[in-house]
Amino acid sequence: MLTFEHVRKNYDSKRVLEDCSISFEPGKVYALVGPNGTGKSTLMKAAAGLVKINGGTLTYKGQPIGTESKKHIAYMSTEPFYYDYMRIRDVKAFHKDFFADFDADLFDRLLTFMELTPDLKVRALSSGMAAKLKIAVTLSRRAEVIMLDEPLNGIDLIGRDQIIHTIIQATGNGATFIISSHLFDELEPIVDNVVMMKGGKVILEGELEAIRAEHGKSISDLYREIYADIAVPQF
């Protein structure tokens, strides 16, 4: 469905994706894990058509990533992507006009569940509220592939529960989900497959239970083992 074959990506002289190969299959939920700087965000941005790869092939349903694939792939970045002067109702109107698959009624329901109101200004949102808004916007697209980059960052425990519940509900529509997060323990109940990246490459990929059985340890313990040489907080 969404396939990377020996993909390379450079930012100036820095190689951020190196011989990256993986295929994401329809209807599955993938956890994309690894410390900062391992290529997770760049992989997502390339799939969303936001950055151009320098080598290899990247296709969606056999066709190169481009205008057509953007109609079917929704991507939530870690960066804010609204103007400060907007109210939430303006964000809704913008996405309704821009994306044919945007479900305005679903967006309204998600706002209610997330305890957000349409008249709130973007500049007045806390980091947690802004994160919830990004989730609501992205999940309101009826896309075939939904990519969420660190959706639990900056969220308190109650907010995380709301977001996890929302994602669980959304996974029932048959879309492929690709979710990057350091908080794997909280994503574990909804994940089908795990993808680990290091040095811009996919170094381990497979079904969650199969990886546990093969390595005889939890994903968290495996993470600590694989990334022991990288000084980052562990989940």
Protein language model features and the residues they cover:
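Helical segment within the ABC ATPase nucleotide-binding domain
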Residues: R160-N173
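Helix-to-loop junction immediately C-terminal to a conserved catalytic motif
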Residues: A48
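Conserved ABC transporter NBD signature motif
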Residues: G55-S69
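ABC-family P-loop ATPase nucleotide-binding domains
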Residues: T78-L133
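Conserved structural motif at the start of ABC-family nucleotide-binding domains
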Residues: L2, L17-D19
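Catalytic Walker B motif of ABC-type/P-loop ATPase nucleotide-binding domains
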Residues: I146-E150
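The feature captures the beta-strand-to-loop junction immediately N-terminal to the Walker
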Residues: V33-P35
